[in-house]
């Protein structure tokens, strides 16, 4: 098993400094005897040599680790983003520690404290609330890149999708199919990304001469359970819809389950829109429009901002990543 400088010094009854100078090629400069050099080199040849990363980290105040805090990885977008970001960090020599908050605001703060105690070099965080975001900005003295949610009141580094433009493009394309009302099932407008998607949808309606929000059904939860409740309520009040948009894949999952429960199937005539992309959408019998987030660009942008902050630059940039419309038409 390879040995550290400290272990080599102990084995040979030499000082750590002497061993380090020999291994660093400075033996002649500091007049270390040929005999001592030979002892050290023979020992290394026999056992090998490895860096003591703990000691190196203390000396440099750098651990080459980064932290990522997301709501959960059952959400396809966050799972994919975590994977892409981990791979991007690895390419540059960093390990990424991934933690989930499950939207527990107190636990999120505990995770931040725990990762800071491990002396990570920087943190990527999807904040649960404005209060959490403000807490992190006050408490974290390391490079910080916020992800997905812009609660405002900060000029910190941030990466998010262009959700308003995505909502507008999605609604315009679905309205062009002339199936109305085009309902919007909205889970948790306290999340800035969801509010932006709703605003984009309303913008598309106005462009089509529709100046009301009567087709919007809101609920408090961005979850499958929340989506089920929204669709259940819509069917109770209006019947099975001709067309609808779900504000996220979790909301869509619940909405589809409600349709299956109430009608015994997913009626193929319904036009369905959603945010985020998943191959399983192709198995629906419906025409489906989805706004795909670009996780590869997200990972590149987030790491770029983090690296600049680690290098000492004051980074206050917001990177907005374009979304891509994916269409699946059924005859």
Predicted regions and their residues:
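N-terminal helix-turn-helix DNA-binding module of bacterial transcription factors
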Residues: 1-62
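Short beta-strand segments enriched in small/hydrophobic residues
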Residues: 16-21, 58-72, 181-188
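Hinge/beta->alpha junction and helix N-cap segments in small-molecule ligand-binding domains
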Residues: 71-79, 99-106, 149, 159-169, ...
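Periplasmic-binding protein-like
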Residues: 120-127, 183-186, 217, 238-248, ...
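Flexible loop/turn connectors
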Residues: 232-331
């Amino acid at each position: 098993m390879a040995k550290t400088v400290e272990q080599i010094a102990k084995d040979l009854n030499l000082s750590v400094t002497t061993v380090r100078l020999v291994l660093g090629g400075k033996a002649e400069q500091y007049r270390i005897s040929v005999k001592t050099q030979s002892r050290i080199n023979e020992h290394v040849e026999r056992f090998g040599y490895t860096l003591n990363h703990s000691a190196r980290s203390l000396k440099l105040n750098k651990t080459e680790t980064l932290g990522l805090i997301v709501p959960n990885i059952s959400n396809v977008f966050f799972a994919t983003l975590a994977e892409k970001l981990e791979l991007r960090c690895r390419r540059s020599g960093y390990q990424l520690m991934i933690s989930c908050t499950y939207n527990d605001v107190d636990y999120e703060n505990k995770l931040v404290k725990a990762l800071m105690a491990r002396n990570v070099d920087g943190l990527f965080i999807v904040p649960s609330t404005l209060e959490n975001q403000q807490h992190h900005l006050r408490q974290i003295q390391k490079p910080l890149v916020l992800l997905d949610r812009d609660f405002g009141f900060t000029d910190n580094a941030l990466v998010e999708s262009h959700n308003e433009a995505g909502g507008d493009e999605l609604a315009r394309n679905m309205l062009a199919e002339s199936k109305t009302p085009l309902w919007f099932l909205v889970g948790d407008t306290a999340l800035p990304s969801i509010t932006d998607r709703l605003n984009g949808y309303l913008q598309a309606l106005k462009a089509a001469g529709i100046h009301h929000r009567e087709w919007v059904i809101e609920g408090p939860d961005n979850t499958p359970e929340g989506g089920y409740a929204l669709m259940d309520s819509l069917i109770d009040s209006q019947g099975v819809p001709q067309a609808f948009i779900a504000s996220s894949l979790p909301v869509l999952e619940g909405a589809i389950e409600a349709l299956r429960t109430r009608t015994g199937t997913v009626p193929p005539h319904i036009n369905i829109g959603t945010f985020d992309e998943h191959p399983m959408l192709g198995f629906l019998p419906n025409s489906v429009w989805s706004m795909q987030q670009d996780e590869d660009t997200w990972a590149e942008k987030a790491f770029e901002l983090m690296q600049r902050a680690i290098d000492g630059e004051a980074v206050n940039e917001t990177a907005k990543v374009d979304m891509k419309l994916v269409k699946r038409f059924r005859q």
